[in-house]
Amino acid sequence: MDSRLLEIIACPRCQGRLQLDKENERLICRFEHIAFPIVQGIPVLLVEEAVSLAEDPKDIT
């Protein structure tokens, strides 16, 4: 994912900064404790598609 894109996109729920998790192909919002999938290189920034980090075994600490 382009680092410039990562600097301008934000969490759709809280508008917080997102962190890239390359290994699991997702963007993480540490404020809301949710992750958004990246599908074929495109971030899916829909709250309905987000996965709770509390329930996800791939959570990175």
Swiss-Prot record:
Family: Belongs to the UPF0434 family.
Organism of this sequence: Mannheimia succiniciproducens (strain KCTC 0769BP / MBEL55E)
One CC-aspect GO term: cytosol
SUPFAM superfamilies: Trm112p-like
Pfam family, any one: Trm112p
Classification via InterPro entries: Trm112-like
Protein known as: UPF0434 protein MS0934
